[in-house]
């Protein structure tokens, strides 16, 4: 897998996460209901939800129901969230410094 496989440069730690996750199924974060998509699903999910139209600077990487998680294209490793029904109208909210921090925060909240 190349860092620019999706037409932009993936953040370092997210790229590392994708190369380590060898499965074709989404990465389920504990029992939280949050999944991070496998690399094979990323383009399809972004096309399905028309992310390029509503939030062209962001790339969908996972979700829990209507709540979606994103990275910013050609940017740092920050993870953002937004409601899929509010894309383009509500500002993205930063929720973690990187994908590993995000996973750890979710797992800690489950305890």
Label each region the model flagged.
Residues 75-87:
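Intrinsically disordered, low-complexity regulatory segments enriched in Ser/Thr/Pro
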Residues 1-70, 109-111:
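A surface-exposed partner-binding patch
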Residues 87-109:
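Compact, glycine/acidic-enriched structural inserts
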Residues 71-74, 91:
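Short conserved micro-motifs at the rims of enzyme active sites and ligand-binding pockets
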Residues 74-75, 96:
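Small/flexible residues
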Residues 1-5, 84-90:
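Charged, low-complexity surface segments at secondary-structure and domain boundaries
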């Amino acid at each position: 897998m190349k860092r620019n496989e999706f037409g932009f440069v993936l953040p370092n730690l997210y790229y590392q996460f994708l190369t380590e996750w060898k499965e074709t199924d989404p990465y389920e974060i504990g029992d939280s209901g949050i999944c991070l998509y496998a690399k094979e699903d990323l383009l399809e999910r972004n096309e399905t939800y028309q992310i390029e139209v509503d939030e062209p600077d962001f790339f969908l990487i996972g979700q829990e129901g209507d709540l979606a998680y994103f990275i910013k294209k050609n940017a740092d490793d920050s993870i953002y969230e937004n409601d899929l029904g509010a894309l383009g109208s509500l500002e993205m909210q930063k929720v973690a410094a990187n994908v590993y921090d995000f996973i750890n925060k979710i797992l800690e909240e489950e305890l």
